[in-house]
Regions:
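Loop/turn elements at helix/coil->beta-strand transitions in domains of secreted/extracellular proteins
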Residues: 21-25, 52-58, 80-84, 104-110, ...
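Hydrophobic alpha-helical segments within soluble ligand-binding/sensing domains
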Residues: 1-24, 69-71, 94, 118-121, ...
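Periplasmic-binding protein-like
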Residues: 25-30, 81-91, 97, 108-113, ...
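Extracytoplasmic "Venus flytrap"
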Residues: 29-41, 92, 144-147, 168-175
Length: 241
């Protein structure tokens, strides 16, 4: 596994909020699913570290995925004076919440949502209300990385994808490429591909500079995890929409 962790989400989200100058009342939106239960866990999720940093997390209850009514949550956020909204949502749930927030006069100054805002197609579907939303950023063509297989730089990979597909690049592109890099590197170094132990030894000894950064399982937080960089970013309307 090479990716970032929830601790990185907390770090980049709070860094973004700290630079915004808004009050520390945060509306929390956590679904009753694996991601929502992890993010909303009182000890291991967002509540404890946010409280330690002086944030007041307003979280009435976990909502059911594909809910069609967020009125109870919106009323609680309005009463608490929440100026920040955060959580981890699938696109349909955020679309429903964001539409109802507008209808009910809830206008937070900062909206930082995990998962739902990763892809441009969904953000574009929100129209003008997609402008200014913020989220975690796994990878972009502006990241200072290149392919260990081809030498292609992140900028070139993004441009090639756009020109060949006619679609905008997305954050998963770099990781999809990196999977092939790691696979090729493991195969190249493995002493016997028919021996499970040899394959595992090759994987665990990986130390490779990839399209998403360094993949090295010898220095991760646990043996099967290699951390990759995470930043936050804001969606802004460009000349191409």
């Amino acid at each position: 596994h090479f990716f970032w962790g929830l601790e990185d989400i907390i770090a980049v989200f709070t860094d973004l909020w700290g630079s915004s100058g808004v009050t520390k009342n945060v509306a929390g939106l956590f679904p009753n699913d694996a991601d929502g239960n992890a993010w909303g866990h009182p000890e291991l999720g967002l509540p404890k570290p946010l409280s330690e940093m002086g944030y007041n997390l307003v979280h009435p209850d976990h909502y059911q995925p594909l809910s069609d009514d967020f009125s109870a949550q919106i009323n609680a956020y309005k009463e608490a004076g929440c100026e920040i909204v955060t959580g981890v949502m699938i696109p349909p749930d955020f679309g429903t919440f964001w539409s109802q927030a507008a209808q009910q006069g809830f206008n937070p100054k900062v909206v930082t949502i995990g998962k739902a805002l990763l892809f441009p197609s969904f953000v574009n579907s929100l129209g003008d209300r997609g402008n200014g939303l913020t989220s975690e950023i796994w990878w972009t063509p502006d990241h200072p990385f290149s392919s260990s297989l081809t030498g292609t730089k992140a900028k070139e990979l993004g441009n090639d994808y756009v020109s060949s597909t006619g679609r905008k690049w997305n954050q998963g592109l770099g990781f999809q490429h990196a999977l092939f890099e790691v696979t090729a590197d493991v195969i190249k170094r493995c002493s016997d591909l028919d021996d499970v132990s040899a394959v595992m030894a090759s994987i665990s000894s990986t130390n490779l500079s990839t399209m998403v950064g360094q993949v090295n399982w010898s220095n991760g937080p646990v043996k099967n995890v290699s951390k990759t960089p995470l930043v936050s970013g804001q969606w802004q309307k460009g000349n191409d929409g």
